Amino acid sequence: MSRDRGTSSQKIDYGYGQVCYENGELIKDLLLTNVQQEHGIIQMRNGSNAKLPDIKTGDMLRILPNHACATAAAHNCYNVVNNKNEVTNVWDRFNGW
């Protein structure tokens, strides 16, 4: 994750990222609203009528970050996974800006 709020001045602000179930299904109006070095905070979008999902401790979620350069730069390659979490490809990282 990144502290970059790339969507803050856009028509729709997605905080630090959109929250999904482990299978990649978006959770309506659930956003990553704050990030720290070791954790993040997820909340419903202000004014949302969506129902808060029943997420329990230990449930796996995915975040669609609005910016991930710092995270991506920490890895030599990226694992591409399918909907069963099986690695289907490995992408080498392009170095340099």
Language model features: what each stretch is:
Residues 1-97:
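Active-site anion/phosphate-binding pocket segments in diverse small-molecule metabolic enzymes
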